[in-house]
Amino acid sequence: MPITPATATPSSSNGTAEAILLELVDENGVTIGTAEKLSAHQPPGRLHRAFSVFLFDERGRLLIQQRALGKYHSPGVWSNTCCGHPYPGEAPFAAAARRTFEELGVSPSLLAEAGTVRYNHPDPASGLVEQEYNHLFVGLVQAELRPDPEEVAGTAFVSPAELTERHAQDTFSAWFMTVLDAARPAVRELTGTSAGW
């Protein structure tokens, strides 16, 4: 799998679309290079930087999304509000805000860091591996959603009880419970104990 220094600039000499590069990191989250997105997710996977966003409405309900059916990785499954990968050199906070707007057509009214979590989750359905150093963010959303259908097949605001029910019947991303559990202390601080998270 190709690895380049994190400061390298991708180039395309044949006029085709440039490869999407991800930041490879060590176990402490320190950038050690880049790799093409698909190759970083092929078994056994390469540890790379990612982010996960959890946005809540004024009633303390979590916004979840169903990933578009056209995605090559985990299509059609439900997951957290937004997740993705910063561009090499891009701050995870900036990437989280950018991708939330690109996918859902809305900017959070509040977005705060909620820690990091490291995991390795094979996805049997796609044969790919999520080996990520994931930056977590929690926040509030108040504007009307305008999801991009190329990215998002559906959205729902759910209470903890509704999420438990959905999780029992619908397919969720391999990483969903790991990132939600890691973000729970910040979620509780944001939503208050009465919300039940």
UniProtKB/Swiss-Prot annotation:
PROSITE patterns: NUDIX (PS51462). It catalyses: isopentenyl diphosphate = dimethylallyl diphosphate. The active site is at residues 83, 132. One of its GO terms (biological process) is dimethylallyl diphosphate biosynthetic process. The lineage of its organism: Bacteria, Bacillati, Actinomycetota, Actinomycetes, Kitasatosporales. Keywords: Cytoplasm, Isomerase, Isoprene biosynthesis, Magnesium, Manganese, Metal-binding. The keyword Repressor does not apply. Catalyzes the 1,3-allylic rearrangement of the homoallylic substrate isopentenyl (IPP) to its highly electrophilic allylic isomer, dimethylallyl diphosphate (DMAPP). It comes from the Bacteria. Its cofactor is Mg(2+); Mn(2+). It holds the Pfam family NUDIX. It comes from Streptomyces coelicolor (strain ATCC BAA-471 / A3(2) / M145). Pathway: Isoprenoid biosynthesis; dimethylallyl diphosphate biosynthesis; dimethylallyl diphosphate from isopentenyl diphosphate: step 1/1. It is found in: Cytoplasm. Mg(2+) binds at residues 83, 103. This is Isopentenyl-diphosphate Delta-isomerase. NCBIfam families: IPP_isom_1, PRK03759.1.
